[in-house]
């Protein structure tokens, strides 16, 4: 796979994840967000990027943790 194609796929996965979440498609959000994580790992392992990109879903994860801690 060409480096630029992998980066484009990673960007597409992020867009689709947030789009899915915004439309209450939670299962598809999980699919696309995990795809982004995998592409990020592949890009790093293949030397396409020097270090992993920050996870764009981290704030959502932290918010979910805060909600469950309050319950």
Where are each of the predicted segments found?
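C-terminal-biased regions
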Residues: 1-22, 27-71
